[in-house]
């Protein structure tokens, strides 16, 4: 018995309590930016969202800048109701609500995605409260309902979620995802809704109050997964660097500095960042990002900042120093490869985003960062664990 208890304590310390790991496969698909660029509609999006890409910034502040989702490529499947109705979602640590399209939605985006039918679910309960989430220059609005939500064998009972009845603009029409499942802290939730992971903890569905994210770098994304209830040491090398959460809303942490090459260029006296699976790129204050683009030799062309694909081996590394530990992105890691009219195009994975006080200014470490560094989100100790991801 003592041996078993000792083993259990060791496994708990490793984030691997017996039966703790519930793995949600994440598929990697073509990003919305690539789709719109191929259809010649990307410039139209910039104009519709009041975006000035030459300045790399959103002109208008928003609760959820729509630009964050342009390069999202990692998606998972959930089901809502009895019998289950399936939806493809972004698992987003930068927000806290779950929403999917409603059968009552008349927006163009709802015509191209699965919609939730409350009348077809025997476990559905009407809550009736309205909700609204600001995206760029438009709002996603709807009503709140409650039903059981299942994620790879974990079934949350009585989960309140948003049923969108209006989705802004034409952007979501082309998106690969139907909705968003937020994994941020409750303070971010619109309408005072309890987030899905909080209900998982309250209903004792996870052995440990943590989840982790592995995003594969290979084009097909095979092996990418979200893990509830712990973390998988096979996805990273070395030890996790545990970083305290500085504010319990986003998964917000402190940066000690940002190096370009061997020189500290930003945050020499420290600054704040969030680790965000719902943001595809790495973002920062627009002025800082413009300086960074210039230091990397990136030039502005049409719809963003590009670099010469042949020059990657001569470009500078970018290093984020977090809790005293350097996290270095080489040019191959922070550069996005695309094909336009049959030609290879390389762009940087950095974008300017103005986040106004009191929430900002903030840097956002999105998927470009998380692909290189395995991320563990520990609600029990309010900390984020980071370690080099195993390819």
Curated annotation (Swiss-Prot):
Residues 20-53 form a propeptide. The keyword Signal applies. Disulfide bonds join 105-110, 267-271, 309-346. It catalyses: Similar to cathepsin D, but slightly broader specificity. It is an enzyme of class 3 (hydrolase). Glycans are attached at residue 86. Its EC number is 3.4.23.34. The keyword rRNA processing does not apply. It is found in: Endosome. PROSITE patterns: ASP_PROTEASE, PEPTIDASE_A1. GO terms for molecular function: aspartic-type endopeptidase activity; identical protein binding. GO terms for cellular component: endosome. Transmembrane segments: none annotated. One of its GO terms (biological process) is proteolysis. SUPFAM superfamilies: Acid proteases. Residues 74-387 form the Peptidase A1 domain. The active site is at 92, 276. Glycosylated. The nature of the carbohydrate chain varies between cell types. Belongs to the peptidase A1 family. Homodimer; disulfide-linked. May have a role in immune function. Probably involved in the processing of antigenic peptides during MHC class II-mediated antigen presentation. May play a role in activation-induced lymphocyte depletion in the thymus, and in neuronal degeneration and glial cell activation in the brain. This is Cathepsin E.
């Amino acid at each position: 018995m003592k041996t078993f208890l000792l083993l259990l304590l060791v496994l708990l310390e490793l984030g691997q309590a017996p039966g703790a790991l519930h793995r949600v496969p994440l598929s990697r698909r073509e990003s919305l930016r690539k789709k719109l660029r191929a259809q010649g509609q990307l410039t139209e999006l910039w104009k519709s969202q009041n975006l000035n890409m030459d300045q790399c910034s959103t002109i208008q502040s928003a609760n959820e800048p729509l630009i964050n989702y342009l390069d999202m490529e990692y998606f998972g499947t959930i089901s809502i109701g009895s019998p289950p109705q399936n939806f493809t979602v972004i698992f987003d640590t930068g927000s806290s609500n779950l929403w999917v399209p409603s059968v009552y939605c008349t927006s163009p985006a709802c015509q191209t995605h699965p919609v939730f039918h409350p009348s077809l679910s025997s476990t559905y309960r009407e809550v009736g409260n309205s909700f609204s989430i600001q995206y760029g220059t438009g709002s996603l609005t709807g009503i709140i309902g409650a039903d059981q939500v299942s994620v790879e064998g974990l079934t949350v009972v009585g989960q309140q979620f948003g049923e969108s009845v209006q989705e802004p603009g034409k952007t979501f029409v082309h998106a690969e995802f139907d909705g968003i499942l937020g994994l941020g802290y409750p303070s971010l939730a619109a309408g005072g809704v309890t987030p899905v992971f909080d209900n998982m903890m309250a209903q004792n569905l996870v052995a440990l109050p943590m989840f982790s994210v592995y995003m594969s770098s290979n084009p097909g994304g095979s092996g990418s997964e979200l893990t509830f209830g712990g973390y998988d040491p096979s996805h990273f090398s070395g030890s996790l660097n545990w970083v305290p959460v500085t504010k319990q809303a986003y998964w917000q942490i402190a940066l000690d500095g940002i190096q370009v090459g061997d020189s500290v260029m930003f945050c020499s006296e420290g600054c704040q960042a969030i680790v965000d699976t719902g943001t595809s790129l790495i973002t920062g204050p627009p002025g800082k990002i413009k300086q960074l683009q210039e230091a990397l030799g990136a030039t502005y062309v049409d719809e963003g900042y590009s670099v010469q694909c042949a020059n990657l081996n001569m470009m500078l590394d970018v290093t984020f120093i977090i809790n005293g530990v350097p996290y270095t992105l080489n040019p191959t890691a922070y550069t996005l490869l695309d094909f336009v009219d049959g030609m290879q195009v390389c762009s940087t994975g950095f974008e300017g985003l103005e986040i106004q006080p009191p929430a900002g200014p903030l840097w956002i470490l999105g998927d470009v960062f998380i692909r290189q560094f395995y991320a563990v989100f520990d609600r029990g100790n309010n900390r984020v664990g980071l370690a080099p991801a195993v390819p």
